[in-house]
């Protein structure tokens, strides 16, 4: 259930966003961009944008809300939804739904758990989901891009080839994860094909406005922007639940405590969040904390739920 203050109405979104942006601008210590992906390391950590999309597609924004950025792990939400729509509960035989507690690219748990990743949002789990979507579609990254273009209404969304190449050049840990899971029979496609799809997936550039709109199906309980159903209401609930418990790497507990919404972050500095039945949000600021989440992004979402009174608790 979403709890909202009695006086809250959608027309107040814009002044709330402007107040948040003003507070963020005056906040020192904004973290550091991801430096292990060279193409992201040059981002200015003080950039900031935030957008809110209502269920009918009305969007409010502030700051750099129309500036495209590297979506990175945010795309894991959409590949999860696309695969879940195709194969349903069979997916959960190959990936779990539990928080990891370890870094997002850790190999440690995989060995203890026989090649079954803890959840779909750590890198190992995301590789499994992309692998299964590749088997289903023949072009996982292309299917994802087509979906994001349709839901955002932006046909110009595209892959950033420089980011994809940068990730491939520094992707030894992901390659190790892929080969390790393949040794347990939990990867169907060749690891090089899988990695190419995964790196392209993570390289998609989109703005806060694009991603807030694209996430709308989760606030509409599985209904896409065109009115067709992607997920059952139960499946949409499942995706939101996994976002809440696993969506911000090993800081999910703190994110739930501070923000109180399902969310998914990426090392490009973006975070999406869902208010079921009401709206979706995306915030971007490239400076990250030690766990890989946007410092200003988490702070902005914290302020949003505090100022508006929205929460899933």
From Swiss-Prot:
Keywords from the named record: Hydrolase
InterPro entries: Beta-lactam/transpept-like, Glutaminase
Enzyme Commission no: 3.5.1.2
Swiss-Prot/TrEMBL catalytic activity: L-glutamine + H2O = L-glutamate + NH4(+)
UniProt keyword annotation of Protein biosynthesis present: no
GO biological process: glutamate biosynthetic process; glutamine catabolic process
GO molecular function list: glutaminase activity
Enzyme class of the recorded protein, top EC level: hydrolase
SUPFAM superfamilies: beta-lactamase/transpeptidase-like
Metal-binding in keyword set: no
Classification via Gene3D superfamilies: DD-peptidase/beta-lactamase superfamily
Residues where substrate binds: 73, 123, 167, 174, 198, 249, 267
Annotated family: Belongs to the glutaminase family.
Assembly, per entry: Homotetramer.
Protein name: Glutaminase
Organism field: Streptomyces avermitilis (strain ATCC 31267 / DSM 46492 / JCM 5070 / NBRC 14893 / NCIMB 12804 / NRRL 8165 / MA-4680)
